[in-house]
Amino acid sequence: MSVELWQQCVELLRDELPAQQFNTWIRPLQVEAEGDELRVYAPNRFVLDWVNEKYLGRVLELLDEHGNGMAPVLSLLIGSKRSSAPRAAPNAPLAAAASQALQAAAANAAPAAAPAPAPAPTSAPAKKAAAQKAAEVSEEPSRDSFDPMAGASSQQAPVRAEQRTVQVEGALKHTSYLNRTFTFENFVEGKSNQLARAAAWQVADNPKHGYNPLFLYGGVGLGKTHLMHAVGNHLLKKNPNAKVVYLHSERFVADMVKALQLNAINEFKRFYRSVDALLIDDIQFFARKERSQEEFFHTFNALLEGGQQVILTSDRYPKEIEGLEERLKSRFGWGLTVAVEPPELETRVAILMKKADQAKVELPHDAAFFIAQRIRSNVRELEGALKRVIAHSHFMGRDITIELIRESLKDLLALQDKLVSVDNIQRTVAEYYKIKISDLLSKRRSRSVARPRQVAMALSKELTNHSLPEIGDVFGGRDHTTVLHACRKINELKESDADIREDYKNLLRTLTT
């Protein structure tokens, strides 16, 4: 009976919690029953402490509500339910098995394939090996190859972008840089980049018949460049003789200026209009460059008319690029425009585990979770944080622990805590919606105030470690059920209301960048 009651409570928690939190902390729980006792297993003290603070109270409430007066006695253990000698943790909470959460995250990140079976309970060493293997499915994108620590004998030298020179007759020498380390195989896929990855693969595997142009947009360090290089590398793998040209938009401008200086503009046009695939990064740098926009406009038209593939990236939606001609914005919308969002928690953990594995460094799962929960903005910041931790570990001759991470990232963590405080969230939301902070704390229920208040509560729940009662208290003394309702409402609206979805995304980016 205890196991059935537990499963019932888990289903209720699935409805109450955001999918990310449920999948990370609740879904992988290991339980077993013996008589009236329900044993719940967690992998380590870090996870126990986290769940104790965030979820234990609600779990006990549900067990009591649905146990018909016969709620089971909970025994909380550290280990696995098949472990021969689990370690008791008196007064410890229910917890998620972090290693299995990693397996679930990596499974979600893998390219579409046959559904993987649910992980069976295993011994702790086997779980660790399986989680590490799962984390190796892919690698999160970055502009530069990973070089965690210069001078460390245990690490490989960084792999630089390969220079691929395409020579044509005339005065100009055209160079395309494709980074061979950026492939689809080592790209970590998650909810934040799933559509972008699928679209890029469609273009790479079926050029000229997929989406043309493909326009990827999003903040820095989220994987746009990785996907662009992955397409180019796949095209060359299929056809080594293909003329695939990757360049930054400023390089296109520089080439055009040089062509004008050398009186070789016809050669410039002939080269760029004869490629099989043109990949241009950071197209927003064309803004207010009228001659460059004019030339690119005609090049773009010629390529699409000839059935050649065009892929573009930008840090913002094309129609939001100020100083870009409307005719270009219109043409960029002819194909598919896809946003690349900041990675969610599971993906961030998988990134860190993969990068640590590449660097041949042992990164405990609780350490990966600790970093991932605090560095939310983009992959480059994650990599930078991990590099500092690895360097600190190497120079101090110490293993990577939570304590060492706190020491090595002290300034960064202090800044993050300052940026994502509830006070700062309230101030940022009030400024965004052009209302007063006092409105957020008031009893006013008009939609112009109530909706921003709900957004601020949802952001506080996602970005801080405060409990629901604590959040309610700083929003005018509201109770935890009001905060829970606000979070559920905003999650629903993000699925159905494009304006709320865009507002939430903009605020999240502001608070975590």
From Swiss-Prot:
Residues 1-87 are annotated as: Domain I, interacts with DnaA modulators. Keywords: ATP-binding, Cytoplasm, DNA replication, DNA-binding, Lipid-binding, Nucleotide-binding. Residues 123-135 have a biased composition (Low complexity). Coiled coil: none annotated. ATP binds at residues 221, 223-225. Pfam families: Bac_DnaA (PF00308), Bac_DnaA_C (PF08299), DnaA_N (PF11638). The keyword ATP-binding applies. Residues 177-393 are annotated as: Domain III, AAA+ region. GO terms for molecular function: ATP binding; ATP hydrolysis activity; DNA replication origin binding; lipid binding. InterPro entries: AAA+_ATPase, Chromosome_initiator_DnaA, Chromosome_initiator_DnaA-like, Chromosome_initiator_DnaA_CS, DnaA_C, DnaA_dom, DnaA_N_dom, DnaA_N_sf. GO terms for biological process: DNA replication initiation; regulation of DNA replication. Oligomerizes as a right-handed, spiral filament on DNA at oriC. Domain I is involved in oligomerization and binding regulators, domain II is flexibile and of varying length in different bacteria, domain III forms the AAA+ region, while domain IV binds dsDNA. This is Chromosomal replication initiator protein DnaA.
